[in-house]
C-alpha cells in the first residue's frame, strides 16, 4: 500500500465527520474552497477491516473494534488546531461503489491513519483484489491471540 505523493494528489480538508460507518468507511463534509462544501462517503484506501454486519461473531467483534478504533483516532481531529485531510489520487480517486478513495492524515503527520490501522492490527492491507479474512493475524498483531 503506497499513499499518493503530496504533489501528485488532491488534498481535501474535512470540515465535519458526519458518521463512521465501519472500520474502513466514513461520511464527511469536505471543503471545496470558495465557501463550497460537499458531503462525501470515503472508503479508506489500501485497507480492509472485518465486517460489523455479519453473522460471524468473531468477525463482528473485530469489525466493531476497528470501527471504535477509527472513531477514537478521528475524535477531535477537526475541532482542534489540526486539520483532517483526505488525500486522493489525481486519477482513479473513486472506488467501484462511487466512494472517494482516500488516505487520512491528521495535521502535519506523515503517517496516514490507513497505515496505522494495518500496523496496529485493525485492518489488512487491501489492493482491491481478493479480501483477506485472517482474524488470527489481526489478533496476534494486537496481542489478543
Give the location of each predicted region.
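Small beta-barrel nucleic-acid-binding modules, primarily SNase/OB-fold domains
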Residues: 1-145
Amino acid at each position: 500500500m503506497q499513499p499518493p505523493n503530496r504533489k501528485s494528489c488532491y488534498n481535501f480538508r474535512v470540515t465535519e465527520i458526519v458518521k463512521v460507518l465501519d472500520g474502513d468507511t466514513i461520511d464527511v463534509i469536505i471543503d471545496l474552497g470558495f465557501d463550497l462544501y460537499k458531503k462525501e462517503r470515503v472508503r479508506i484506501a489500501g485497507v480492509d477491516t472485518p465486517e460489523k454486519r455479519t453473522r460471524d461473531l468473531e468477525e463482528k467483534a473485530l469489525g466493531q473494534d476497528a470501527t471504535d478504533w477509527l472513531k477514537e483516532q478521528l475524535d477531535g481531529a477537526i475541532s482542534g488546531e489540526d486539520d483532517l485531510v483526505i488525500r486522493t489520487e489525481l486519477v482513479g480517486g473513486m472506488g467501484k461503489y462511487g466512494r472517494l478513495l482516500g488516505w487520512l492524515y491528521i495535521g502535519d503527520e506523515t503517517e496516514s491513519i490507513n497505515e496505522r490501522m494495518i500496523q496496529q492490527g485493525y485492518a489488512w492491507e487491501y489492493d482491491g483484489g481478493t479480501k483477506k479474512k485472517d482474524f488470527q493475524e489481526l489478533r496476534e498483531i494486537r496481542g489478543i491471540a
